[in-house]
UniProtKB/Swiss-Prot annotation:
The active site is at 98 (schiff-base intermediate with d-ribose 5-phosphate). Belongs to the PdxS/SNZ family. This is Pyridoxal 5'-phosphate synthase subunit PDX1.1. The modification N-acetylmethionine is found at residue 1. One of its GO terms (biological process) is pyridoxal phosphate biosynthetic process. Its EC number is 4.3.3.6. D-glyceraldehyde 3-phosphate binds at residue 182. It catalyses: aldehydo-D-ribose 5-phosphate + D-glyceraldehyde 3-phosphate + L-glutamine = pyridoxal 5'-phosphate + L-glutamate + phosphate + 3 H2O + H(+). The keyword Nucleotide-binding does not apply. Catalyzes the formation of pyridoxal 5'-phosphate from ribose 5-phosphate (RBP), glyceraldehyde 3-phosphate (G3P) and ammonia. The ammonia is provided by PDX2. Can also use ribulose 5-phosphate and dihydroxyacetone phosphate as substrates, resulting from enzyme-catalyzed isomerization of RBP and G3P, respectively. Also plays an indirect role in resistance to singlet oxygen-generating photosensitizers. InterPro entries: Aldolase_TIM, PdxS/SNZ, PdxS/SNZ_N, RibuloseP-bd_barrel. The keyword Iron-sulfur does not apply. Homodimer or heterodimer with PDX1.2 or PDX1.3. Interacts with PDX2.
Length: 309
């Protein structure tokens, strides 16, 4: 059922399928390889090397981190392919890059230059207000954001191999990321208590594909990896998201907008690895220097997360 976007089922930490793997299942498997890791935003090769040395499982190559996108305004587009290629040449870990929502040509360019994953991102300016990219048309895995279970399953049906919370990138404020992961996981807990008749009604209520709703109920989790993103700025933030049930963490402005990026990058990786060990978390949280300047999410702050559904 690969053509419909049904995902292979989780086994003991690995993909399991009774039939031959579909192209989509392969992409889901590639995304699963990043479980338990930290993905860091970088704007040049030097930052990419710092991230790799700190233990990041992948880097996100972009010209401006979300905090700068917020501060500078204007239209935020796909990064210069030359810059992305320089970052790819500087590290051995996977490299991601962002495309605007609905801008399938930006995604085609990113695939052509050899990025490992594409993030169809609400942090960039929308290219299409009504349609997301048909991600089944691509060979590489896509990452998409969500605020709730309905959004997550719609993105998976379109071909997303990884889901992340939208949060509010560039704010250094984790409250929206927490809200989004609690929304998704709370809905899944509710779903597991439903009978078959109720599942039909619930799928319609959240505007999600029925077969993916059923699969999520059976698994007790999303059928693809779920990372936290948007506002993660400290080791404690990262560990919080892991304890809430995420499979890994994206860190954007929180590292390279801080007082000591090298030390903070290593600390966040350690926090994700040891997210249930309070003694380790206390140790890695010491002496990190000044954290990035955060934003209170009031009416004056643009909500990137609301740009798409």
């Amino acid at each position: 059922m690969a053509g419909t976007g049904v995902v292979a089922v989780y086994g003991e930490g690995a993909m399991t399928e009774t039939k031959q793997k579909s192209p989509f299942s392969v992409k889901v498997g590639l995304a699963q390889m990043l479980r338990g890791g930290v993905i860091m935003d970088v704007v040049n090769a030097e930052q990419a090397r710092i991230a790799e040395e700190a233990g990041a499982c992948a880097v996100m190559a972009l010209e401006r981190v979300p905090a700068d996108i917020r501060a500078q305004g204007g239209v935020a587009r796909m990064s210069d392919p030359e810059m992305i290629k320089e970052i790819k040449n500087a590290v051995t870990i996977p490299v991601m890059a962002k495309a605007r929502i609905g801008h399938f040509v930006e995604a085609q360019i990113l695939e052509a230059i050899g990025v490992d994953y594409v993030d169809e991102s609400e942090v960039l300016t929308l290219a299409d207000e009504d349609n997301h990219i048909n991600k089944h048309n691509f060979k590489i895995p896509f990452v998409c954001g969500c605020r709730n279970l309905g959004e997550a399953l719609r993105r998976i049906r379109e071909g997303a191999a990884m889901i992340r919370t939208k949060g509010e990138a560039g704010t250094g404020n984790v409250v929206e990321a927490v809200r989004h992961v609690r929304s998704v996981n709370g809905a899944i807990r509710l779903l597991r208590s439903m009978d078959d008749d109720e599942v039909f009604t619930y799928a319609k209520k959240i505007a999600a594909p029925y077969d993916l709703v059923v699969q999520t109920k059976e698994l007790g989790r999303l059928p693809v990896v779920q990372f936290a993103a948007g506002g993660v700025a400290t080791p404690a933030d990262a560990a919080l998201m892991m304890q809430l049930g995420c499979d890994g963490v994206f860190v954007g402005s929180g590292v390279f907008k801080s007082g000591d990026p090298v030390k903070r990058a290593k600390a966040i990786v350690q926090a994700v690895t040891n997210y249930r060990d309070a003694a380790v978390l206390a140790e890695v949280s010491c002496g990190l220097g000044e954290a990035m300047v955060g934003l209170n999410l009031d009416d004056k702050v643009e909500r990137f997360a609301s740009r798409s559904e």
